[in-house]
A protein has these predicted regions:
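Donor nucleotide-activated moiety binding/catalytic core segment of transferases
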Residues: 53-68, 256, 261-307, 313
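Structural motif
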Residues: 4, 72-73, 207, 249, ...
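Conserved catalytic-core segment of nucleotide-activated headgroup transferases in glycan assembly
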Residues: 165-268
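Catalytic core of nucleotide-activated saccharide and alditol-phosphate transferases
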Residues: 99-189
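A short, Lys/Arg-enriched amphipathic alpha-helix followed by its capping loop at the start of a domain
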Residues: 18-28, 239-243
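Leloir-type glycosyltransferase catalytic cores
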Residues: 122-164, 330-397
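Active-site and donor-binding regions of nucleotide-sugar-utilizing enzymes
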Residues: 7, 12-18, 35-131
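A donor-sugar binding/catalytic signature common to diverse glycosyltransferases
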Residues: 73-85, 286-332
Length: 397
């Protein structure tokens, strides 16, 4: 059967448009569903279905569309978005391939990657060693430009897509204002943060690192036991106050893309008072070199951040509090958080090398989503992955 691809919502960039063009150039049928004016702005390839109704009616709309058009594959970005969940359910019922970004069936906690270290020890020696890939330029200003263009176009939604409701918990214009304020805060505190890091490292103060994640991230909202980062910090600081060495400290580093809507210094003061932790045992950073912190940290506590992978690269003891693809015996601490401060162990280096190579080999491509150069790299690498009948992970089974 000739492959027929349906693209749903992608990132706020030309990536899906370029990918659609590439798929079409191979002779495959390509179409897309646009849910808002931003989607329409970034799609110029070919057929586009415009869904203008409320999301409550979307499941039936997908059912009719899938039966009529006989699609073999759907491609989407973000498997928890309300506009995607009914599509995934229908696709799986009809044995339609689901590509979430570049991974079959799901990402993060929905990934098909095994959690059994024995599987990686068996498969690992058969997988080639991967480097960090070819570098590319992708300035943050390009990502910001695409995001703003997407949401400015969205000002037409009330007329063009009256039923659309964003999946984001905070409106874009609110985030933009807060981010400008935070950019000023980062600039003002950069020297202070660097001096604090240097003092901790050169004084050999034992410290544990907590990399913050975004409250809006589906990794927190859908793949963790927490409603937000405050919940995670209350649990972690309470445990640290009770169970850690009294001469150790916590270094808490904010996410580089945090909008600044949360006042973390004030929040941390409140939590310290609540759990009985002295505030001098907390160092909060808005900026600073993460590799330097990872090189010297006694361990890392995260929900399920990609920084967890970096911690494993640096051989740091790691505790994951949420669902993470790297959370398995031999890589992360499997005991409870209270015992981690005293008994956390370094990851198995060989197991991590096999795990990393397998993840790259089966689920990753070299490229990006925002600059022209990085998009071209992504499309070139993605095309053969999308056109195979079996995923690379399935071929290893």
């Amino acid at each position: 059967m000739k492959r027929r691809f349906l693209l749903l919502q992608g990132p706020c960039s030309p990536f899906f448009d370029k990918l659609g063009q590439a798929l079409k150039s191979t002779g495959r049928h390509v179409a897309k569903v646009n849910f808002n004016a931003g989607d329409s702005l970034y799609w110029n390839t070919c057929t586009a279905w415009k869904y203008r109704n409320h999301v409550d009616h979307l499941a039936e709309w997908y059912r009719i569309l899938f039966e009529r058009e006989d699609y073999t594959d759907i491609i989407l970005f973000g498997d928890h978005r309300p506009v995607h969940r009914p599509a995934i359910a229908h696709a799986k019922a009809l044995n339609i391939r689901v590509h979430v970004t570049m991974e079959r069936d799901g990402v993060n906690a929905h990934s098909k990657l095994p959690k059994d270290p024995a599987w990686y020890r068996h498969i690992g020696p058969r997988i080639p060693d991967y480097s960090n890939g070819d570098p590319f330029s992708s300035p943050f200003r390009l990502r910001a430009w695409h995001d703003v263009a997407y949401h400015v176009a969205g000002m037409r939604n009330r007329f063009s897509y009256p039923g659309y409701q964003t999946h984001a918990p905070v409106m874009a214009h609110v985030e933009y204002r807060a981010y400008f304020r935070r950019a000023f805060t980062i600039s003002k505190n950069k020297k202070r943060d660097l001096a604090a890091i240097q003092h901790i490292i050169y004084s050999r103060i034992p410290f544990w690192l907590i990399p913050l994640q975004l409250n809006s991230d589906s990794q927190i909202r859908n793949h963790s036991p927490f409603n937000n980062m405050r919940d995670m910090l209350e649990l972690t600081l309470s445990s640290f106050a009770r169970m850690s060495r009294p001469d150790s400290i916590l270094v808490i580093k904010n996410h580089p893309l945090d909008t600044g809507l949360e006042n973390y210094p004030r929040m941390l003061e409140d939590i310290c008072q609540k759990v009985g932790l002295e505030t001098h045992r907390i160092v909060y950073l808005e900026s600073g070199p993460l590799p330097a912190l990872l090189n010297h940290a006694r361990g890392v506590v995260t929900v399920n951040s990609t920084v967890g992978g970096s911690a494993l690269v640096h051989g740091r003891p790691l505790k994951a509090l949420g669902a993470a693809i790297y959370d398995m015996p031999g890589l992360t601490y499997q005991g409870n958080l209270d015992s981690f401060w005293r008994h956390g162990k370094q990851p198995d280096r060989r197991l991590f090398r096999w795990f990393r190579n397998t993840v790259i080999h089966t689920t990753q491509i070299n490229g990006g989503l925002y600059s022209g150069e990085s998009i071209d790299m992504s499309v070139t690498a993605a095309l053969p992955r999308l056109l195979t009948n079996k995923s690379l992970l399935e071929t290893l089974a």
